[in-house]
Design a protein with these regions (language model features):
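Catalytic nucleophile-loop/oxyanion-hole region of alpha/beta-hydrolase
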Residues: 91, 110-144
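Alpha/beta hydrolase fold serine-hydrolase catalytic domain that processes acyl esters and thioesters
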Residues: 3-44, 77, 137-142, 159-304
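Gly/Ala-rich beta-loop-alpha elbow adjacent to hydrolase catalytic centers
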Residues: 149, 153, 157
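Short, surface-exposed "cap/lid" segments of acyl-processing enzymes
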Residues: 71-101
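Short beta-strand immediately N-terminal to the catalytic nucleophile in serine-hydrolase-like folds
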Residues: 147-149, 185
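N-terminal cap/lid segment of alpha/beta-hydrolase-fold proteins
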Residues: 31-71
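Alpha/beta-hydrolase active-site loop signature
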Residues: 86, 114-118, 189, 285
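A fold-wide structural signal in alpha/beta-hydrolase
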Residues: 78, 106-110
Length: 304
């Protein structure tokens, strides 16, 4: 990690320990209203600039940003990039990360703007991601598609694998194959057992990014906004990873890593333990592998 990144991390930890950074309030309905207001302040607008050729597609009522390597044609490989967020629509900050992945790997990038769970159910977001992925596979072929997800986008990536298996198990006439590769940076998900909840709370106390109580309030908000959300969209222990592709998971020693063992156990249960490559980096920060100063995820994607 660079010197500047270490300084930023130290400042964030100091601010949190000093009590200057507050977590969410205890009024769940009020927090949902705040999240919705935040989303309204950040409406989607197609990016401009010469760093990529941008095109806005639509998957139903939701936009999907296509970042093309070449203005007048598509390449023969693609990335499905799932940005973080969850309770609010914070699509813009990761556009540059997604574009950089495409530039370094020579791949087109599809960037769906999934709805936050305070606006639509997690099932609707998962269905959007599945439909976008299926469309990409029809154009490029599954062997040419990689999926990258960070934080809540990492949860969407895990959901996608489970959704593919559910679709195929239902005997649909158009089975959907798995992607060639999946890279998840600090994937967010919920602990299933009280032991893991306790671990998450201990890790939250030291986490420079997530406030104390983040997991509890996110789950409470989800249950309030979308009470019919199935466990298979919340807990890795209830997901189906049969036939999963090579999956690289990067965590810092952070609160999100409380579900690392659940992911590992689920891959083993579903017969693909050797396809999961998990790395927990002490002293790093949330989504560290996707940061420009790291390059770890870039190296996996490009084979360097």
């Amino acid at each position: 990690m660079s010197v500047s990144a270490r300084i930023i991390l130290s400042v964030l930890r100091a601010v949190k320990k000093a009590g200057l950074r507050k977590g969410r309030g205890t009024d769940v309905e009020a927090e949902i209203r705040k999240a919705r207001a935040c989303s309204r302040r950040h409406p989607y607008r197609e990016p401009r600039g010469g760093k990529a050729s941008y095109l806005t597609l639509h998957a139903g009522k939701y936009p999907c940003l296509l970042m093309k390597r070449e203005k007048n044609r598509l390449t023969d490989k693609a990335i499905l990039y799932l940005h973080g967020g969850g309770d609010r629509d914070v699509w813009k900050p990761e556009v540059s990360f997604a574009r950089r992945y495409g530039e370094r790997a020579g791949m087109d990038v599809f960037y769906p703007l999934y709805p936050p769970f305070t606006e639509a159910s997690p099932e609707e977001a998962a269905d959007l991601v599945f439909r976008v992925y299926r469309g990409i596979v029809k154009r490029y072929g599954a062997g040419a598609v990689s999926v990258i997800g960070g934080s809540y986008g990492g949860l969407l990536g895990l959901q996608l694998l489970s959704r593919i298996n559910g679709h195929n198990a239902a005997g649909e006439r158009d089975p959907v194959p798995m992607p060639a590769l999946m890279i998840l940076n600090s994937p967010f998900a919920y602990p299933k057992t009280e032991e893991k909840w306790a671990l998450a709370e201990r890790l939250e106390a030291e986490d420079p990014i997530l406030p104390v109580g983040a997991f509890r309030y996110m789950l409470e908000m989800t249950r309030k906004a979308a009470p019919d959300t199935p466990d298979s969209l919340l807990y890795p222990a209830d997901m189906d990873f049969r036939g999963a592709p090579e999956t690289w998971v990067f965590y810092a020693d952070e609160a999100c890593s409380a579900v690392a063992e659940a992911i590992r156990q689920s891959y083993a249960r579903d017969g693909v333990p050797d396809r999961l490559h998990m790395h927990i980096e002490p002293g790093m920060m949330h989504c560290c592998a996707s940061a420009p100063c790291s390059g770890k995820a870039d190296g996996i994607l490009t084979g360097r």
